[in-house]
Amino acid sequence: MVDMWEVEIPSLTGKKKRRAYAYLPNDYDLTERHYPVLYMFDGHNLFSDSEATYGKSWGLADYLDAHKIPLIVAAVECNHEGNERLSEYSPVDFTFRNGEPVKGKGKKYMDWLTGTFKPYIDENLRTLPDREHTAIAGSSMGGLMTLFAVAKYNKYFSKGAALSPSLWAYGTNLVEFIEKSKFSKDTILYMDYGSKEFDKAGIAKTNFCTATGALIQKGVNLTSRIVKDGTHSEASWERQIPIFMKVLELN
């Protein structure tokens, strides 16, 4: 089942409300068990087609129910105003493809997630709150934020899945960002890109391969994949759920 409520992120949007979601295993009310938690971005796209931005969700609740996976998933919808999703889901300032400058507010978002949202989840649900049992995942800009979270908030997250991460936002600073980050030796990271996402100029593939190499050099336990016929879409990311769940040892 998926519970929904409203939250505020004062540092980003003041008292404006946005939806938060928590997937709970079907046996949650039947046991006293405590569960690992997977935090995710773009919560509105995860569970219900009717709420998904483009009419297709990840179908995540259906997958978890069908496979009886003992896991809590906690997520918040993005900011839908203008380019605010890009802003909140980027750790760095960048210029969008239309030439518009975007101010990176990703650190503020992660400070709220780790300082307010995670404590709320741990206090109100039967979680295993330690780092070993806490993971994070997302796609596109959420994939970029997953990489940022695992790199800069490693004391909270021992594992992450970055699907089709928007590495272009870092520009030429991508390698420097990875090299200056501190990863615990037990950090597990899944990262992929769809073969149909690569541009003709090869920039996306270069960024992906560069990030892969830098992460391996840092000693991260990395599983890196190019998904055959993969696209930048919820339908494509849904098909990767069994794979990254296995890599993150959440299944």
What are these regions (language model features)?
Residues 1-251:
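Non-catalytic cap/lid and distal C-terminal segments of serine-dependent acyl enzymes
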